[in-house]
Amino acid sequence: MPLHNRYTKDRTRTMVKYSPKEHAPGTIIADVLTVTEAGVTRYFFDAVDVATKFGFSYYFNKQTSQNIVNFYEMFKKVFPFKIKKWQNDNGHENLGLFQQRLKQDGIKQVFSYQWCPKINAYVERFNRTLREEFLNVNGILIKEKDDFDKLLIDWLVYYNSKRSLFSLNLKSPLQYILINYKMANMCLTNTCSCKK
């Protein structure tokens, strides 16, 4: 494929100028948090629902399109609503296989402008919370991957079920979902599908 054709396809991206103000669940903002410790780099793929602040994170050793497809599949299993829109930055991992996967599922993909963290404010706040409350406490250099996975899943369950958020009137995301969207307790706490 000639070089100029590759760039003309990129012009068809839907760009957003403002942070979404959704009141119904299903608008997801995603980002990648890069953490390096003692020469080891991990890429934490994070996603947050705008309306409910439901958050999910998982880490990979590489920032590839296949890894974000895997992350997306994991997120779909634990997110209790249908995904309608997926907002992300212009990173190379958000193109290719991932774009095709979103099209197959009928999900609109929108891109934020570079160097505009206010557009991704919800996921940037989640990244900060993940870094301060989990990564700074546990680090990323745990010997066994299964041990780290268990700690991360435990923290995600805590974040979504017990941690109070000011943006939700001091309720956790799952409490907010139960009150506002009348869902059963059983469907919200099943995390066994997160395992690879």
Feature annotation, model-predicted:
Residues 1-46, 54, 70:
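Mobile-element integrase/transposase regions
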Residues 63, 81-95, 169-172:
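Acidic/histidine-rich, metal-coordinating catalytic segments
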Residues 40, 57-81:
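Active-site beta-loop-alpha junctions of metal-dependent nucleic acid enzymes
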Residues 5-6, 10-19, 105, 132-196:
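C-terminal domain-tail junction helix/linker
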Residues 53-58, 110-112, 136:
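Short small-residue beta-strand/loop micro-motif enriched in glycine and branched aliphatics
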Residues 31, 53, 89, 120, ...:
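Short, conserved catalytic/metal-binding motifs centered on acidic residues
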Residues 88-103, 109-133, 143-149, 153, ...:
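RNase H-like two-metal-ion nuclease catalytic core shared by retroviral integrases
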Residues 33, 48-51, 91, 162:
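Anionic group-transfer/hydrolysis microenvironments
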